[in-house]
Structures are given as C-alpha cells and as structure tokens.
Amino acid sequence: MKLNFKVELLGRPTFQPIIEVQRSSSSISKFLSSLVPNLAPDSATILVAGVGSGNTTWTLHTVIDLCLQDSSISVCFVSSRCAINSQMKHKIARQLKCEHDLDCYNEIGLQQLKQIGPVTILTYHALYSMIREGDSRLQDVDFFIFDEVHSLVQDATFVSFTGELLRDLPRFFSSAKRIYLSATPEPILAHLAKVESQPIHVLRFPSHYPQWKPIFYADESILLQHLHSIPKTEKALIFVPSISAGRSLSSKFDSAQLITARTKLENPQKWQELLSTQELSARYTFSTSTIDAGVSLTDPALRHIVCSSIDPVEVIQQAGRRRLKSGETLSVYIPLPSQQQLWLQLSRLEETLSILRTTSNNQSLFISKYVLEEDRTDIRQLCYWKDGKILPNYLAIASLDRQAQNIRHLINAKSPYILERTIYHALGLSLPADNRFIYLKHRSDGEISAFQDWLHAQVGEISEKDSFSETFKTQYQNCFGARKNDRSDRSWGLSVIKKVLSTLNWGFSIEAKRGIWVLSDLRTHSEGGEKIG
C-alpha cells in the first residue's frame, strides 16, 4: 500500500490523499464480495479494472445481493451513457427476479425507466438535473455507484456542467458508500481527490489487452483504402469526431450506418436491437462518442475498430467496445499525426485555453467577444451560468490542458516511435523487437494497376509455381503491406493466394487442377496454368 499525493490543482480545496492498492487477484467477484459489505458510510473507493473485466457487472451484482438480504438498503447507479443503463436494467431486473416487469415497456419507455426495486438508474445528466432542482430523494441512499467516472473529464469539452456535478457528488451523497468505477481513471483521479471529503482508496486490478493488434496510419486515405479491402465476412466500427465527419465518411461505403445520440430518439428500435443483440447490422458502422462507453459488442464479425483519438484513454474505451473470447483478435487503428498536424492541434488548444482564462479578467469582454458570437459555439459549450456569471467548466480546462500536454510530449520527444510506445504501454503490450510496429502502407493507384495488369497477364500463361507465388506475394505487399503472419522467408501457398484473391474481389480465382495451378478471370471465363516446379 502506498500513499500517493497528486499534483495540486490551483484554486481548488485541499485534496484528500489517494491510497492505492494493486490487486493481483484474478477473481474480481470474490474480492468484491468481501470488500463491499465492509465499506463505511461517507467513504470513497475507486475500482479500476480493464474494459470487459466485469467490473461494473460484479460491483452491481454484489450490492444487489446485499439489497436482497436487507430490504432497507437502497442504491443509486449512475453512468455516462444511456447504453450502459439500458444493458444494466435487464441485469438488475434479472437478479431481482422481476425481469418480466420490463416486458410492458417499449424502447423509449425502457430508456426513461429510472427505478427497479431498490435501485435508481440514472445518467449523470439526469442526476445533475435532480440536484439542480433540489430533489432530495436520493440523498439517503446507502450505495452510490458511478460507472465510467472518468467521463466527467472526457465529456467536459461538450457537456458544460461536469465540473459542477463533480463538486456536488460528495456533498449530495454524504452518507453513502461511494463507489467509482473506471478502466481509465487517470483523467479524473486528481480532481476527485479535490472534492472528496474522505481519503480515496484506489483498488487497481491488472489490465492488459494482448488480443488487440495496434495498427497505425498516417493518412485518412490510407485507412479508407484498407477498410474497403477487408474481407466481406468482417465488420468495422469507425469512431468519428463529429456527426458531419461521420456522414461524410459513411457516404464512401456500401452497407454503412451512422450511430449518433439522435439514433436512440429517432430510431429507438434500432438502438434497442443494437444493445440486445450486441451485434452491428451493417458491415461498416460509423459512430460518435454515443457508444464509446458502456456498449458491449460480442459480434464475432467485428474485427476492426478505428479510434478517433491518439489519447490512450480514448483508445482503450473505444476499442474496448468489442468483448473478445479466447482466441479472438481485434485490429485497433490509431491515427499517426505529422509534426505539422500536432502543431496545428496544439495551436488550437492553446487559443481556446487562452480565451477561457480571460473570463476572470474581463467578463463583459468575454461575453461580447466569444459567448455572443454566432460562430463560437465551441466556446459556449465549455461554459455554464452561475451566480450571475458565465464561467468555464474547470474540467473542460483540465481536459484541454491534458490534451495539450500530451501533444507537447509528442512534439518534444527526442526518441522516435514515442506515440507507438505510449499506446503499447497503455495497453500493457510488450514492445515489438526492433520497433517493428504495424503501419498501414499507402498503396497508390499505380501500384494497384500494376498488380491487376500482372494478374491479367498471367491468365493463359504457364510459369513456374514458386516464381508465381513469390511475385504474387511481392505485388500484394507493394500495394497493401505485409499481412499479420507473413514472413520474409516463406512463400505463399495455394490456400493463401485463394484467400487473398477472394478478399481483393477483383474477379480472379485460382484452383489446382491435375497438379497445375489454374488462374481464372471470372469476368472473361478464361484460364491459365502455372506448372509445379
């Protein structure tokens, strides 16, 4: 056990010590069954475990077990997303043996349902409204559970009240046993220590993601070309920074859908189907942050997730939507910005931070120049109204500061591969030998045309098998880069070439006929053979 004091945050109250314990136990459920009943009122505990570990499910399950033993116990469960709550409502009802009571609700009604037995289920948006309206019904609950608590910082750049809500939590739930859950608590931990009335106990389980394969790309066009070439039997989930970006990108693909916050209102049946089946209905799904937390996807065809950020916290949360079974793997795509792009991002962040810091110096100038300007919605959504003043959300400033610090770290790094190493470290992965990270290679139209022309030339020709195999492999890698299991000292056999041709979907196939490889152009129905050497 170690006492870990975090950096002071200017202008905030004295922070509580953070007492951190590393847990090596592999059984979260067994540990929670001994921990939760012994928590004291007005205590603060953060449980940290990797995405997909069952941290949320087992915490809630353990607390509800206590409710079943003692009918006087009450619980408030709060999360960052409606999706989390929708999935948890079914689990809560199942454990309380009242799941049939949910049958009378349609999709919208289920979203609006806030009480199941002794458990109140809210998003943090709904909780904030209750606190602001002076609703005191929840102040005497025995357990307060906040899932994905880091979202108060991560969402702060588009939800203006997260800082105010964080300040209110320990006061509003002052008699409760407060349990915070997160796989990525780093953004929120110091801020939570500022507002909590008691020392914070951080119980951290090891988290690593050996089934994830990070793939880096330097240009969006490279990514789009690659996604178009994935096997037809596989699906991709692509996170986008905005609805407009999602619309633009999804228009470039067949069998594509866009999921946004509006989906659950405009198409609640589709939304509920996504949550209940845990599968994607389109080959390519583009999504805003609506499903970047809480949505669990078990779709075996989902093999590719594209992250919209280089922040390790967001990479983990977005890639973590796919729940993997033993033996399954996931390709996780991460942008690799250039120095010029990093400088541009940093410049924008510093400009926004400079504007927000003018609020304390000159309110009237800040309001007239930024808040009332029609094209400055970016500034307005960072601010809230209190006591006759328009104030910036201090967690938004913290979030922007954190982004700026991360970018400065990349810009000023003396050693190469700094972003790649940072991501590998965050995912608990061993660094590849000789820094052999995986990158998407830009394939030019010329290289693709050369490959296609070469294939056309082989139809009707007879050549030595090993020569054909080696040339085919080289041509493919010139266009698309090496595949995961490719080795320089191994040629491709017939089965590999057949699979690659099927994936490319260029109208070629290859078969073995009487010891001869026969390459066919399916569009012209002509054949050629390569004899075995």
What residue ranges belong to the model's regions?
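N-terminal helicase ATP-binding lobe
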Residues: M1-L181, P185-F286, T290-Q317, R322-P337, ...
